[in-house]
Swiss-Prot record:
Enzyme Commission identifier(s): 2.1.2.11
Highest classification ranks of the organism: Bacteria, Pseudomonadati, Thermodesulfobacteriota, Desulfuromonadia, Geobacterales
Gene3D superfamilies per record: Phosphoenolpyruvate-binding domains
Listed PANTHER family: 3-METHYL-2-OXOBUTANOATE HYDROXYMETHYLTRANSFERASE (PTHR20881:SF0)
Binding site for 3-methyl-2-oxobutanoate: 46-47, 85, 115
Protein name: 3-methyl-2-oxobutanoate hydroxymethyltransferase
Amino acid sequence: MNRAKTILDIQKMKATGEKITVLTSYDYPFTRIMDECGIDMILVGDSVGVVFAGHDNTLPVTVDDMLYHTRAVTRARPKALVVTDMPFLSYQTDLRDARINAGRLVKEGGAEAVKLEGGAHVTDTIRAIVDMDIPVMAHIGLTPQSIHRMGGYKVQGKKDEQAQRLLEDALAVQEAGAFAVVLEGIPLKLAGRITAELSIPTIGIGAGPHCDGQVLVIHDILGLCEKYSPKFVKRYGDARTLISDAVASYISEVKKGEFPTEGHSFS
């Protein structure tokens, strides 16, 4: 596909059974690489607060932070659909704030859709944003912005009543107009059931193989993070060692006077 993907392309992939690939990106270089590889969707995640800025969770991330990183991503003009997270307190206070902040992420940041966390209780917010012609991706299950209420990063929906509530949440966000929904940290059978019940795509992270697509954090799959890696993460490379070796070699050559050489100098 030579043109940029739209939400209609993403939804069509569910209908045809083609798996949807999603990765987070926070900057221009990574976005260029991902797009060249043919990624379907890029999520400018509020996970930037953890893997990029060093916070313990996503709560400190602001709208201005998301705007900065969204601009960096969209400057790469990717063919992938660009979705940006709405950070904590950017949509929970009232509908007016939600509309304004979603509008800024699209108008100023260049995002093509926004993502927000929550189920049935955020359906009014989803409708309000969709009514502005801004596509919304929902996010249910383990919602990182609710870390304190959930008591940490714990799998959700293990009990029957919790599973039923998550199914109802999924149906509610679909009814409210979400074009897709992220299922995070839920049992694989529940994710499969939700995926079968919905007409919109499900994007899993720690939700097993039965979702319509998968999303992971780019720093996790590259092995860049020192911190604990969740069970659902698969490392596809060891970029941290590669970078460490390069930096160590640079330091060594400068200390020994081996760099720069005449070949790296001007006459």
